[in-house]
């Protein structure tokens, strides 16, 4: 499969690859990801027990979520198309003495293998690929019957634009400028429609809210900006 056939935005891939060496710096450019990671883990554990489960972390980056899942007892495979991020993830896991199967691999290739997973996580990735529906379909093909899939992304509305682009990238400098493209944001209704067309059933949608005075994130009923969704394949 050539790069042009893969569900990859080369500019997005290069942008995040350039952040590889700063990935595990909690005060660096990936600080928001460090702040949001405990909330993602909390949400997953509200939906399913991790211990002993086979988990696929799609778009694992430098391994923030993969390591958290492994520390909570999951058997984790992390895939990402960035070689530099996979190298960072492997090195950090080795330092932490964690056994995580990291692969620089296209998820579409994995669908041709026999292995299926109890849990699939695809966090902060859908808004960075050319065809998010195709990504969801591939995730659905890799889940076991009764397994759970978790997606997190950003709603598409004026409030989300103000918070995640104007606020986070330009006013408060929480993220590097150009991290997000508003046109790539995804409404919950769109995510649900794409997932259902891939044979998935929605179990829950929960928002993520940022408290600027506390400088922390938490789960919320408000899905107008960042949100998490849990689906199952029956």
From Swiss-Prot:
Positions with a binding annotation for S-adenosyl-L-methionine: 40, 59, 80, 123
Keyword Membrane (UniProt): no
Reaction it catalyzes: a 3-demethylubiquinol + S-adenosyl-L-methionine = a ubiquinol + S-adenosyl-L-homocysteine + H(+); a 3-(all-trans-polyprenyl)benzene-1,2-diol + S-adenosyl-L-methionine = a 2-methoxy-6-(all-trans-polyprenyl)phenol + S-adenosyl-L-homocysteine + H(+)
Any one Pfam family match given in the protein's UniProt record, by short name: Methyltransf_23
Keyword annotations from UniProtKB, A to Z: Methyltransferase, S-adenosyl-L-methionine, Transferase, Ubiquinone biosynthesis
Pathway: Cofactor biosynthesis; ubiquinone biosynthesis
Key word Methyltransferase present: yes
Entry's EC annotation: 2.1.1.222, 2.1.1.64
GO BP field: methylation
A Gene Ontology molecular function term of the record: 3-demethylubiquinol 3-O-methyltransferase activity
Transmembrane segments: none
Family statement: Belongs to the methyltransferase superfamily. UbiG/COQ3 family.
Stored PANTHER family: METHYLTRANSFERASE, UBIQUINONE BIOSYNTHESIS O-METHYLTRANSFERASE, MITOCHONDRIAL
Name of the molecule in the record: Ubiquinone biosynthesis O-methyltransferase
